[in-house]
C-alpha cells in the first residue's frame, strides 16, 4: 500500500476535500499494455487549471469521490485508480484540451461493455466542474479484447455463408417504414430480392405494432426469401428486427427466425442496450444466424463536437459486444460524415490491427487480435449515381443500402433493385479493369443505363 493511501495507527484519518491532482494527475506514469486508455476532450469551467480537471475526470470515472473517505485506507488506490497521464491543447480551441486517462484492467468485468461504459462514461459526464466532456477514443488492451466473443461470425464467414465474393453486398430498407400490412411488406421484400439485391431490411422503428405483428412479418418475409432464392439461384436475406421491449421477447423472436431457417436477424443496439445485444450476439453465433446492427439514437450521443462520445467509440464497443454489420454513415449521402474520419472508424470495424493516426481521428493503436471484423453499412440518402463513390470509398467489404434509392424508382421496386445491381456490377467491373471511379464514375453509370431500367 502506497504512502499516499496507507492508513497508519500513528497518523489517523484526516477528513476533508483535497485537490484531485494530488492523487490522480501523474504525468510521470508509463502506461501498461493491460491498461484501458481513454482520450477525453475536456471543456472546463473558467479558472480551473487543466491538471485539476483532467485529474477530476480520472478520479470520478474510477475510484474517486468528492471528499476523502476513511475506507480509502482499506485498499490500494495506487493499484485501482485511474490516472490522467498526459494533457494536450486542442488546436484552434483555447478553452479545450485532451486529457489522456489510463485505467487498470481490474476495474472492469470481463466481457462486459455495459460495465466498461458505466465507469468510463458514467456520472463523470454530469460533473458540474466541467462545462462539457467528450470521449474521443479508447484503447482496448489485448487482455480485455480476449474476454469478448465479438461478432457472431465476421466478414469471411458471412461471405462463405452467402457464397458472394469480390464486391460489396447490396441492401434496401423497406419503405414506408411504418404502416404496411405484413403481406404487402413481404411483397416488397420479394420484389427487391428478386430484382437482384442481397438483403432487405426492417426499418429500426419496426418491432411489433398493431398494423403488423412481428410473427406475421417474419412469416411473409421468410416466404419472400425462399421464393426469390428459388428464382435467382442466389442466397438472400432480410434483416428481421428482433428488438423488443424485453430481452425475453427479443430472444423469442430470434428463436423463431432460426426455426424459419432465415440467415440473419437485426438489433437496435443502442436503444436495446449492450447487455441485450451481447446476449443476442452469443445466441446468433451458437445458432448460425448473422446479426445486423442498427445505430438508432447514436446522434444523441455523438452529434455534438464537445460533449458525448465519438462514434468510433460506439463502433469499438459494438465490435466487442457483437454484430456482423453496423451502419457507419456514407460520406456522400444525406447524413453527416467526413471522409477521413469515417474511414478511420470503418477500418476500426474491419481490420485486425489499426495504427494511431490523428488525421483520421484515431488516438491509439488498436490490436483486435482474433476478434472477427464487422461489415460497415452505408445507407441513408444514397442512389445509383453515388455507386462509383461508394464502391471506391468503402471497397468490397461493405454493405451498400438503398431505401428510397431502390423503392423510389419510377417503374417500381424490382426495377429499382435491378438498377442498383447493374450499377454495382458496372462499377466493380470498371474498377477491376483499372478505371478510376472518381474520374469516370458518371460515364460508367451512363454506359450501364443501356442494360438497366
UniProtKB/Swiss-Prot annotation:
Instruction: Return the annotated site residues (Transition state stabilizer).
Output: 334
Q: Which UniProt keywords apply?
A: Acetylation, Calvin cycle, Carbon dioxide fixation, Chloroplast, Disulfide bond, Lyase, Magnesium, Metal-binding, Methylation, Monooxygenase, Oxidoreductase, Photorespiration, Photosynthesis, Plastid
Q: Which CDD domains match?
A: RuBisCO_large_I
Cross-referenced PROSITE patterns, in alphabetical order?
A: RUBISCO_LARGE
One cellular component GO annotation, for this chain's record? chloroplast
Q: Which of the residues bear the PTM N6,N6,N6-trimethyllysine?
A: 14
Indicate which residues the UniProt annotation says bind substrate: 123, 173, 177, 295, 327, 379
Pro-peptide residues, renumbered to this chain, are 1-2
**Which cofactors does this gene product need?**
Mg(2+)
Catalysed reaction, written as an equation: 2 (2R)-3-phosphoglycerate + 2 H(+) = D-ribulose 1,5-bisphosphate + CO2 + H2O; D-ribulose 1,5-bisphosphate + O2 = 2-phosphoglycolate + (2R)-3-phosphoglycerate + 2 H(+)
Q: What is this protein called?
A: Ribulose bisphosphate carboxylase large chain
Amino acid at each position: 500500500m502506497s504512502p499516499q493511501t496507507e492508513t497508519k495507527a500513528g497518523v489517523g484519518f484526516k477528513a476533508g476535500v483535497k485537490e484531485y491532482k494530488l492523487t490522480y494527475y501523474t504525468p510521470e506514469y508509463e502506461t501498461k499494455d493491460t491498461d484501458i486508455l481513454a482520450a477525453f476532450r475536456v471543456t472546463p469551467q473558467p479558472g480551473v487549471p487543466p491538471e485539476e480537471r483532467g485529474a477530476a475526470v480520472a478520479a470520478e470515472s474510477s475510484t474517486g469521490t468528492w471528499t476523502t473517505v476513511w475506507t480509502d485506507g482499506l485498499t490500494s488506490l495506487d493499484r485501482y485508480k485511474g490516472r490522467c497521464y498526459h494533457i494536450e491543447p486542442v488546436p484552434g480551441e483555447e478553452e479545450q484540451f485532451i486529457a489522456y486517462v489510463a485505467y487498470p484492467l481490474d476495474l472492469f468485468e470481463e466481457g462486459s461493455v455495459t460495465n466498461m461504459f458505466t465507469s468510463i462514461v458514467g456520472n463523470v459526464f454530469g460533473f458540474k466542474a466541467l462545462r462539457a466532456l467528450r470521449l474521443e477514443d479508447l484503447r482496448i488492451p489485448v487482455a480485455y479484447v480476449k474476454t469478448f466473443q465479438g461478432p457472431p461470425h465476421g466478414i469471411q464467414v458471412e461471405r462463405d455463408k452467402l457464397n458472394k465474393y469480390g464486391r460489396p453486398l447490396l441492401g434496401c430498407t423497406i419503405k414506408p417504414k411504418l404502416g404496411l400490412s405484413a403481406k404487402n411488406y413481404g411483397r416488397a421484400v420479394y420484389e427487391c430480392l428478386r430484382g437482384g439485391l442481397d438483403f432487405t431490411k426492417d426499418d429500426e422503428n419496426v418491432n411489433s405494432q398493431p398494423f403488423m405483428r412481428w410473427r406475421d412479418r417474419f412469416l411473409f418475409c421468410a416466404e419472400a426469401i425462399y421464393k426469390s432464392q428459388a428464382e435467382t439461384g442466389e442466397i438472400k436475406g432480410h434483416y428481421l428486427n428482433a428488438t423488443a421491449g424485453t430481452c425475453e421477447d427479443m430472444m423469442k423472436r430470434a428463436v423463431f427466425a432460426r426455426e424459419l431457417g432465415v440467415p440473419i436477424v437485426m438489433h437496435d443496439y443502442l436503444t436495446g442496450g449492450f447487455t441485450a445485444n451481447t446476449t443476442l450476439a452469443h445466441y446468433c453465433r451458437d445458432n448460425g444466424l448473422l446479426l445486423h446492427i442498427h445505430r438508432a439514437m447514436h446522434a444523441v450521443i455523438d452529434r455534438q463536437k464537445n460533449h458525448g462520445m465519438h462514434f468510433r467509440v460506439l463502433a469499438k464497443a459494438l465490435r466487442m459486444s457483437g454484430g456482423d454489420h453496423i451502419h457507419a454513415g456514407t460520406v456522400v449521402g444525406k447524413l453527416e460524415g467526413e471522409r477521413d474520419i469515417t474511414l478511420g472508424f470503418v477500418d476500426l470495424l474491419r481490420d485486425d490491427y489499426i495504427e494511431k493516426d490523428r488525421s483520421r481521428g484515431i488516438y491509439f493503436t488498436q490490436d483486435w487480435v482474433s476478434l472477427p471484423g464487422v461489415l460497415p453499412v452505408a445507407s441513408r440518402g444514397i442512389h445509383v449515381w453515388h455507386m462509383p463513390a461508394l464502391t471506391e470509398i468503402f471497397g468490397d467489404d461493405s454493405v451498400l443500402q438503398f431505401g428510397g434509392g431502390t423503392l423510389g424508382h419510377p417503374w417500381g421496386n424490382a426495377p429499382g433493385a435491378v438498377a442498383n445491381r447493374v450499377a454495382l456490377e458496372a462499377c466493380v467491373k470498371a474498377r477491376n479493369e483499372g478505371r478510376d471511379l472518381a474520374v469516370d464514375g458518371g460515364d460508367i453509370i451512363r454506359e450501364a443505363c443501356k442494360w438497366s431500367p
